[in-house]
Amino acid sequence: MTTPPFVWLISGCSTGFGREIAISALEAGDMVAVTSRNTEDIRDICNKYPSTSVALNLDVTYTDQIIECVRNVISKFGRIDVLVNNAGYGYLSAIEEGEGEEVSKLFNTNFFGALELTKQVLPVMRNQKFGRIINNSSQAGLMAN
């Protein structure tokens, strides 16, 4: 088992829970790969914690970006102890009114993006014989309103 400080890879850190989880982990003394589709949105976090964080561009709908991100985390920190699948967004519409293209885009981000990121990180965790994966979702995905 790995002991602290832990190495975190967190998707979707520009706002909300992803941002707060990244800051909390850094304040606890852990190392964090802070990701966003636009690294300017997370630059302030990494400027505050320059030796224990790295800002990485990541759009989870692109497998090549996921692969590159995981490689960069391993290159910077040597391992990944905690993966937080947080990237995602909501689409407010009744299911029968949802536009096919928009619903497809939502699933590509919220489900398939997390799945692909997990697929790329799992071999790393298996190799190091330790790892935790946290999947963040919306209450709307669990309970109808």
Protein language model regions, located:
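A glycine-rich helix->loop->beta "capping" turn
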Residues: 72-85, 91
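A short, exposed helix-loop element centered on a Lys and neighboring polar residues
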Residues: 118-119
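Residue(s) in the substrate-gating loop at a strand-loop-helix junction
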Residues: 138
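Conserved glycine-rich cofactor-binding loop
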Residues: 14-16, 38
